[in-house]
């Protein structure tokens, strides 16, 4: 049975939605930011030389025994609590048996029928509508190694001449977060992963960098005929699982493509094969991987080398009490306290400056000006330099000082940008840069008056037009004064003075 969509263009997504309902469930793997691996003391640093962070335990050598990493358990409980899950007072690990080169033990220590966290939820908002996504379970496991396929054009095993394996990643602590099949659109799928990423980042338990693989998403997609009114429980169709999506854009595009691919097969009278699939970012299409296993294929059984985990209620409640402010609560607070809109906060988050803006406000800046300077000026500079905004050599306190000087009329926006230039160049604090570069607005009224007089004498025709009522013609005169003052004047004040001298109210 073919898994390739029929020849010709796929149906439009809107046409598919008129006839079918997408049913989407997401499995998200999150690498926990512990200093050592899940069951041994090996380091977890990203980017180390291949096979330099390994030991007999994570290589599965005979006689080695695992020991549970307490920090990983703590981080997993925190994630479960933040997702409103029930935390098991007793759970245990299981062996998931399969053979693959990147799995040195030929089994993975995971959890099966007795996971750590169950029955949670996460609310996500798309275009003003809140969607609640149920969380089936959050369980702990160890990551696999990483296969590197050499000699092909795509970096995949097909077409490669040989493969290499790096076991540095083998044994790194993971949590797998599995949703209910509650998602009904690519947009909600993307929003869920985005919100989950922000929540985990707020907890401080992972850097959730999708481009480095510390957050990876598998999307399970099936279609069913659009349910008739009053029949919400129509059976689901056969699902495919698109593996290892490593960006928000890929999550949305892969789900959308799978929806249209499956619709084309069903329309052609074919059936959907339960299989894993791979998403190609360049083409925006998925391709067949392998048939999808059932749980029985993995021959799960309790891990004999680890005792069950029994978590005291006091331990869980202590972690609950210590949770930081979570993204939804933070958004509500910032909207209430500072007058931001939900779109403002999304823009700040997308630019990676939300924390910096809040720190700038705490240093004394007005919310609107803090947002303006970080979003419109500093985020752009960071992007141009290939940096994260946090890595710029300017602090929230510096930005608050600059905005205060602008508000007091001691700097114009143009001068403020020059001050930022100096701070970023390492010339000192904003006040030191102003003194060193001579950037303050000139307070000498006689100098400004002389510049105004010179501008009027130099352009009598423009002056006459303004006197005649063409007030907007004053622009070139303002420019001439600002040039003479080397930008160290308030343009609005210059305009007022020119109009006064020309007798125009």
From Swiss-Prot:
Superkingdom of source: Bacteria
InterPro entries on file: Asn/Gln-tRNA_amidoTrfase_suB/E, Asn/Gln-tRNA_Trfase_suB/E_cat, Asn/Gln_amidotransferase, Asn/Gln_tRNA_amidoTrase-B-like, GatB, GatB_Yqey_C_2, Gln-tRNA_amidoTrfase_suB_CS, Gln_synth/guanido_kin_cat_dom
GO biological process, one term: glutaminyl-tRNAGln biosynthesis via transamidation
Keywords: ATP-binding, Ligase, Nucleotide-binding, Protein biosynthesis
Catalytic activity, as annotated: L-glutamyl-tRNA(Gln) + L-glutamine + ATP + H2O = L-glutaminyl-tRNA(Gln) + L-glutamate + ADP + phosphate + H(+); L-aspartyl-tRNA(Asn) + L-glutamine + ATP + H2O = L-asparaginyl-tRNA(Asn) + L-glutamate + ADP + phosphate + 2 H(+)
Keyword Ligase found: yes
Molecular function via GO: asparaginyl-tRNA synthase (glutamine-hydrolyzing) activity; ATP binding; glutaminyl-tRNA synthase (glutamine-hydrolyzing) activity
Broad EC category: ligase
A Pfam family this chain is assigned to: GatB_N
Renumbered residue ranges of the record's region Disordered: 220-241
EC number: 6.3.5.-
Known role: Allows the formation of correctly charged Asn-tRNA(Asn) or Gln-tRNA(Gln) through the transamidation of misacylated Asp-tRNA(Asn) or Glu-tRNA(Gln) in organisms which lack either or both of asparaginyl-tRNA or glutaminyl-tRNA synthetases. The reaction takes place in the presence of glutamine and ATP through an activated phospho-Asp-tRNA(Asn) or phospho-Glu-tRNA(Gln).
Family per record: Belongs to the GatB/GatE family. GatB subfamily.
Subunit structure: Heterotrimer of A, B and C subunits.
Protein name: Aspartyl/glutamyl-tRNA(Asn/Gln) amidotransferase subunit B
Organism per entry: Frankia casuarinae (strain DSM 45818 / CECT 9043 / HFP020203 / CcI3)
Gene that encodes the chain: gatB
């Amino acid at each position: 049975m073919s898994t390739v969509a029929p020849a010709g263009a796929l149906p439009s997504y809107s046409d598919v939605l008129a006839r079918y309902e997408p049913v989407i469930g997401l499995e998200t793997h999150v690498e926990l930011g512990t200093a050592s691996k899940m069951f041994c003391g090996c380091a977890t640093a990203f980017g180390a030389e291949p096979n330099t962070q390994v030991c007999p335990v994570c290589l599965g050598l005979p006689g080695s025994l695992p020991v549970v990493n307490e920090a990983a358990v703590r981080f997993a409980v925190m994630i479960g609590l933040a997702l409103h899950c029930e935390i098991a007072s007793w759970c245990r690990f299981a062996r998931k048996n399969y053979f693959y080169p990147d799995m040195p033990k030929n089994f993975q220590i995971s959890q099966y029928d007795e996971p750590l966290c169950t029955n949670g939820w996460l609310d996500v908002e798309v275009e003003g509508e809140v969607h609640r996504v149920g969380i089936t379970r959050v369980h702990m496991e160890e990551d696999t190694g990483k296969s590197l396929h050499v000699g092909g054009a795509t970096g995949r095993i097909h077409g490669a001449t040989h493969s290499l394996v790096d076991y540095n990643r083998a044994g790194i602590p993971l949590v797998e977060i599995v949703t209910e099949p509650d998602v009904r659109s690519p947009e909600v799928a993307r929003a869920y992963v985005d919100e989950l990423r922000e929540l985990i980042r707020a907890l401080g338990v992972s850097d959730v960098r999708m481009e480095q693989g510390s957050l990876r998403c598998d999307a399970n997609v099936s279609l069913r005929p659009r349910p008739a009114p009053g029949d919400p429980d129509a059976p689901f169709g056969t699902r495919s699982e698109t593996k290892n999506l490593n960006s928000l854009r890929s999550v949305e595009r892969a789900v959308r493509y799978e929806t249209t691919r499956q619709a084309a097969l069903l329309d052609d009278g074919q059936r959907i094969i339960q299989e894993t699939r791979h998403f190609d970012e360049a083409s925006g299409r998925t391709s067949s991987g392998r048939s999808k296993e059932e749980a029985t294929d993995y021959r799960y059984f309790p891990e004999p080398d680890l005792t069950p985990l029994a978590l005291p209620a006091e331990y869980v409640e202590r972690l609950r009490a210590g949770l930081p402010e979570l993204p939804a609560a933070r958004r509500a607070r910032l909207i209430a306290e500072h007058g931001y809109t939900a779109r403002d906060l999304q823009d700040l988050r997308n630019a990676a400056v939300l924390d910096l803006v809040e720190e700038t406000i705490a240093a004394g800046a007005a919310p609107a000006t803090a947002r303006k300077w970080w979003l419109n000026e500093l985020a752009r500079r960071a992007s141009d330099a290939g940096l994260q905004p946090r890595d710029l050599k300017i602090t929230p306190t510096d930005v608050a000082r600059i905005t205060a000087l602008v508000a007091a009329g001691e700097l114009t926006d143009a001068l403020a940008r020059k001050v930022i230039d100096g701070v970023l160049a390492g010339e000192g604090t904003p006040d030191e840069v102003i003194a060193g570069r001579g950037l303050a607005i000139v307070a000498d009224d006689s100098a400004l008056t002389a510049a105004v007089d010179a501008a009027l004498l130099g352009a009598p025709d423009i002056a006459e037009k303004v006197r005649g009522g063409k007030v907007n013609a004053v622009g070139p005169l303002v420019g001439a004064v600002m040039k003479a003052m080397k930008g160290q004047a308030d343009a609005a004040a210059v305009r007022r003075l020119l109009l006064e001298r020309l007798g125009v109210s």
